A protein has these predicted regions:
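Residues in flexible loops and secondary-structure boundaries
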Residues: 10, 48, 57, 76-83, ...
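Surface-exposed, charged secondary-structure patches
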Residues: 61-103
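Core segments of small alpha/beta cavity-forming domains
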Residues: 1-74
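Short secondary-structure boundary micro-motifs
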Residues: 10-12, 61, 85, 107-112
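Compact beta-sheet-dominated globular domain cores
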Residues: 88-143
Length: 143
């Protein structure tokens, strides 16, 4: 259906872009650098990220994280609204990263810079097919 509305659409190209977006968005959130990732987030997702970052800052927590890579990635669902032409693709990611949380005193309170943790996320990306804007927005995150 999506290809009918937008013949140039390809799932493998989308997945390649989604993989890059996943790393950029996860690391933007971990590093509290939301300005860089805001253009890729739906407003409500952005607001929830802002709240999460603010909560960390209120507690005096800082995170030092390194992205190792995407271990698994699966297209779980794809649907398109015939009327609005808005497509939604649901992707399940398994990412690996190291993450160290420190308190105001600089003590590690969670994680480790050497221990690789697996993070599972199910994200929904949306876009109006056939529109001039090629970017997909992250409209839902569900660990």
């Amino acid at each position: 259906e999506m290809k009918r509305v937008e013949p140039s659409f390809g799932v493998s190209d989308f997945l390649q872009g989604a993989r890059g977006a996943y790393e950029m968005i996860v690391m933007g959130y971990e590093r509290c650098d939301l300005a860089e990732i805001q253009p890729f987030l739906a407003d409500d997702v952005y607001e929830s990220f802002v709240d999460g970052v603010a909560a960390r800052e209120d507690q005096g927590l800082t995170i030092e994280a390194n992205f190792i890579g995407v271990r698994e990635m699966e297209l779980n669902d794809a649907k398109m609204d015939e009327t609005t032409k808005e497509a939604e693709l649901t992707i399940r990611f398994v990412g690996e990263l190291t993450s160290e949380v420190r308190n105001r005193e600089g003590e590690i309170v969670e994680g480790s810079s050497t221990e690789i943790k697996r993070q599972k996320d199910t994200w929904v990306f949306a876009r109006v097919m056939g529109s001039d804007d090629p970017n997909w927005l992250l409209v839902s995150t569900d660990g």
